[in-house]
Amino acid sequence: MDSFQQLQLRMKDCQKCLDEGFDIVPGAIFSGPQSARAMIIGQAPGVTEVEAKRPFNAGSGKRLFDWLNRAGWEESDFRQNQYMTSVTKCYPGKDRSGKGDRVPSKQEQLICRPYLQQEFRIVDAVLIMPVGKLAIAQFFREFKRLSDLIGQAAYIPWEHRSHELPIVVKKSELTDAFTRKESLGGSWVVPLPHPSGASLWPNKPENKMLIDRAINIIGDIRSAYDL
């Protein structure tokens, strides 16, 4: 059994958050092969993801795959050939109101971080798309507003994969255009807002323009690397 398979088994069997008293539904949700060249990192699975046993299964998945389709990917192709995971791996349960899903605590994020770190190192993705603030913070911790990040990309050299998450990307490292860096080796990180229907951010005209720019960058990277 190789290291990737061992990692998957450890994630599926993990009950560390449950042991710490968090009312999660154990059973990590992720998908995709080790050979994936693109990776999506979400916040955490929702209840429909648990039922379907696949990431981004509900309405948020529809919007996300609408964006990816505009960048050149069919949903079935992406799900089969690319990698999808999240900051925390298990469904965190409902929030106090009972209407929405609970945002994973900082402690839960720390518990799960070694898994994400290993995924980041093992899956040799040339394109990483953190989706939503929790995932974006794994790379862009110094940025507080989505409008300062969406529509931008950052190139992370390969040696940064040995660094502990979060990786701190500086403002000077951001670009709003893709230029292939074949000789360097590494990953392009293109953040996306959370595609949940409950989020109003993607619906604002000025933000739609930023999303369009992000989709164009993703499409350029997909084409350049034949993803």
Q: Where do the language-model regions lie?
A:
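A polyanion-binding, active-site-adjacent surface
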Residues: 1-227
